[in-house]
Amino acid sequence: MKNLTTIKQTNKNVKQERRKKYADLAIQGTNNSSIASKRSVELLYLPKLSSANNFQMDKNNKLLEYFKFFVPKKIKRSPCINRGYWLRLFAIRSRLNSIIEQTPQDKKIVVVNLGCGYDPLPFQLLDTNNIQSQQYHDRVSFIDIDYSDLLKIKIELIKTIPELSKIIGLSEDKDYVDDSNVDFLTTPKYLARPCDLNDSKMFSTLLNECQLYDPNVVKVFVAEVSLAYMKPERSDSIIEATSKMENSHFIILEQLIPKGPFEPFSKQMLAHFKRNDSPLQSVLKYNTIESQVQRFNKLGFAYVNVGDMFQLWESADEATKKELLKVEPFDELEEFHLFCHHYVLCHATNYKEFAFTQGFLFDRSISEINLTVDEDYQLLECECPINRKFGDVDVAGNDVFYMGGSNPYRVNEILQLSIHYDKIDMKNIEVSSSEVPVARMCHTFTTISRNNQLLLIGGRKAPHQGLSDNWIFDMKTREWSMIKSLSHTRFRHSACSLPDGNVLILGGVTEGPAMLLYNVTEEIFKDVTPKDEFFQNSLVSAGLEFDPVSKQGIILGGGFMDQTTVSDKAIIFKYDAENATEPITVIKKLQHPLFQRYGSQIKYITPRKLLIVGGTSPSGLFDRTNSIISLDPLSETLTSIPISRRIWEDHSLMLAGFSLVSTSMGTIHIIGGGATCYGFGSVTNVGLKLIAIAK
């Protein structure tokens, strides 16, 4: 008879085994989401790309589909997820291309997919009908490694789908099929082998069985978001084991948290995987690009090429990027920046003769910028559950009005905000007029001096449905009146009031002039683009502000319509209402890495101090010390207005799609804002305010 201790130990072991099984299934579940997203790319992107950028085409330029065998249902993801997954496909394919291009023809290459899931990569590259993979056909073989339960399903699909069986030779020689091992498949160019990668001994045994220690064989290990769920010491043992084999390459694509676990996107991403019982583990130890380099060097790979996914996007040639921009309407650049900076692509090798060629080389290094702290201002919480983004707000008289935006659906309501010390109350304005603007976002809503009125300019419905209509809202009568439309659509532009009551409009996604002036008296729009080469292209989502005391304005950051380049300049200009031919002239241009912001908002605190808040950058993430900064335009000095640790760690914070408003109390409020964090859920701002510190 078993004693009580033995029974308790047995029960404990059963529970541990059950927990492990559940965790394994949760990790396998992440594969289902990933492969469905790649199917979305296969359906939407690949048919629209030319042969130069399509991974899957036959000799008649017909699209070959491989993901459909594992995801038969037609899937459509959001534009940001689609672009992100196209980039993931490009990441692995481009690294494999670089290896095969530099490997001598007489060398055999084996690609080992660690945690392969339902990835059809072997079938893409071995299919002799696929002219885009001709260089792989006679040179490469594949080994798929994953959990036994998952491989059983994958192998059963391979056996029952003639197209897949034929690619790897199953239909030609039944001897390769071993029905006694349903998680085990062997053909001349394709092996499927079960392995729990948490078991380093099992993995080493498998490497031996597959004869991968042969120095004449080039080994390429691919880990696309598969080691990230393992404890660092276990994933490290996998990497180290592969480094002990001559002629070995390791390609890893996984999550990154370069500004720590409390950066808003990072916090949401970590929480998402934890909720799904597949917590990210390695990323907490190897959270930066530098730490990944050190990791692979320490584990035996002397030569490492590593960068984040936006660096990969930048490395794609211009023709490819232009073609991708045409695939589907896209207006999620802030979210794309955030996604890209949270994924790392690393190619490591122990083969000293291998050269990372220019087309594949990540060579940008970013140094940390330390700023002195601005002791005059601090950021506090201020309850404002507006739950909207990409609307606009302005002060008219003693009232604050917020118009439009999305929550997540586009709206055309006007909210009246009553600002108190620690909270903001809001109510819907009941509009008297029967004719009202359509729901929209990415517009401007700007005070004009004439009788407490607000000017609504442009905006958009869907990303491909820009608007050209303009309206004036009268706060006394609560009526909308439509004014002359623009000759072009315009959204993601900026606008500010000028001392004479006119309104300056800058840039946006438009085919119109780079700068317009709305003359309130004449009720016309006039092209006032400065004669400066900087304004040859329209600036998108730039910061714009004018100071009536110094009679100068500032334009900060802003992107261009290539969706890659973002300005790192602050342009100081003056406005001369008497100069009919050239009312806007550039005085000075300042340049700084922290000016490189897309979607930031700026506001003068004093004529000698400009507040710069939020936005995203192609160069990296902002943190709690540089998300909010101040600029003295005269001395050209920058200071930090740090976000307190308590707000950074505990507050719902996302400095994208928000607005700034100054109040008569001398405070500046961050109103609205938020972003969808890729497939990890949305984050919205609750409310923040900037106050002067009493001396």
UniProtKB/Swiss-Prot annotation:
Subcellular localization, as worded in the UniProt entry: Cytoplasm; Mitochondrion
Xref: Pfam families: Kelch_4, LCM
Keyword field: Cytoplasm, Methyltransferase, Mitochondrion, S-adenosyl-L-methionine, Transferase, tRNA processing
SUPFAM superfamilies (alphabetical): Galactose oxidase, central domain, S-adenosyl-L-methionine-dependent methyltransferases
EC number, UniProt record: 2.1.1.290, 2.3.1.231
Residues noted as binding S-adenosyl-L-methionine in the record, renumbered to the chain: K38, R88, G115, D146, Y147, D196, L197, E224
Superkingdom classification of source: Eukaryota
Reactions this protein catalyses: 7-[(3S)-3-amino-3-carboxypropyl]wyosine(37) in tRNA(Phe) + S-adenosyl-L-methionine = 7-[(3S)-(3-amino-3-methoxycarbonyl)propyl]wyosine(37) in tRNA(Phe) + S-adenosyl-L-homocysteine; 7-[(3S)-(3-amino-3-methoxycarbonyl)propyl]wyosine(37) in tRNA(Phe) + S-adenosyl-L-methionine + CO2 = wybutosine(37) in tRNA(Phe) + S-adenosyl-L-homocysteine + 2 H(+)
Principal location: cytoplasm
InterPro entries: Gal_Oxase/kelch_b-propeller, Kelch-typ_b-propeller, Kelch_1, Ppm1/Ppm2/Tcmp, SAM-dependent_MTases_sf
A biological process from GO: tRNA methylation
Statement: the UniProt record of this protein carries the keyword tRNA processing: yes
Pathways per UniProt: tRNA modification; wybutosine-tRNA(Phe) biosynthesis
Similarity field: Belongs to the methyltransferase superfamily. LCMT family.
Function field: S-adenosyl-L-methionine-dependent methyltransferase that acts as a component of the wybutosine biosynthesis pathway. Wybutosine is a hyper modified guanosine with a tricyclic base found at the 3'-position adjacent to the anticodon of eukaryotic phenylalanine tRNA. Catalyzes the final 2 independent reactions, methylation of the alpha-carboxy group of wybutosine-72 to form wybutosine-58, and methoxycarbonylation of alpha-amino group of wybutosine-58 through the fixation of CO(2) to complete wybutosine.
Name listed for the protein in its UniProt record: tRNA wybutosine-synthesizing protein 4
Species of the source: Saccharomyces cerevisiae (strain ATCC 204508 / S288c)
Source species taxonomy: Eukaryota, Fungi, Dikarya, Ascomycota, Saccharomycotina
